[in-house]
Amino acid sequence: MRLMLLGGPGAGKGTQASLLINRYKIPQISTGDMLRAAIAKGTPLGLSAQKIMESGGLVSDDIIIGLVKERLKNPDCDRGFLFDGFPRTLVQAEALKDAEIHLDHVIEIAVDDEEIIERISGRRIHQPSGRVYHVVNQPPKNPGVDDITGEPLIQRDDDKEETIRKRLQVYHSQTAPLVQYYKEWAETGSKEAPKFHTISGTGTVEQIFDNIVTILET
């Protein structure tokens, strides 16, 4: 089972990815994790990436694809894998295709921007414990304070509306075109093309997961 999840920030990809890797016993392949592991091991690609990162540059798509190919040779990928945060751009998607790294399913978790903003901007954190609340979906007993300690809750900078809107802009300009790319490729009927599905990201975690599993196992 070789999978990719697409969707904006806050669409629930991370939650669903955790459930999927447990169900299908496949690893979650993250470019960040791969970079850190390659640098720690001192592999040639890792050393190349380290030099670029230390000079403040962006690691090239060639290096990223090389790391992906290395990672997929590991025995834990024999049953498949789930890509996390990769590819991010059309250039990376084309490079993945050229490298003959095949996917079985690409699933878009679709959530409206305003719903995403409400989800993320409503989060409140009790910093010392890490307890998370939501002003609408999971409010504290008393507004603005932790249920257990009575200490104030904070809103992280990453959860502020202005920051979320900027992240959504980046998503729509760079990553959202992947939806069209994989949709159009699937419509060609090519044997190499993964199956493409769009599901609603609105509902309970369990409902969304059940919808994904139905798609994968039908």
Curated annotation (Swiss-Prot):
Pfam families documented for this protein: ADK, ADK_lid
Binding site for AMP: T31, R36, G57, L58, V59, G85, F86, P87, R88, Q92, R156, R167
Gene3D superfamilies linked to this entry: P-loop containing nucleotide triphosphate hydrolases (3.40.50.300)
The protein's enzyme class: transferase
InterPro entries linked to this entry: Adenyl_kin_sub, Adenylat/UMP-CMP_kin, Adenylat_kinase_CS, Adenylate_kinase_lid-dom, P-loop_NTPase
Record field: catalytic activity: AMP + ATP = 2 ADP
Domain notes per entry: Consists of three domains, a large central CORE domain and two small peripheral domains, NMPbind and LID, which undergo movements during catalysis. The LID domain closes over the site of phosphoryl transfer upon ATP binding. Assembling and dissambling the active center during each catalytic cycle provides an effective means to prevent ATP hydrolysis.
HAMAP family associated with the record: Adenylate_kinase_Adk
Protein name: Adenylate kinase
Organism: Legionella pneumophila (strain Paris)
UniProt lineage: Bacteria, Pseudomonadati, Pseudomonadota, Gammaproteobacteria, Legionellales
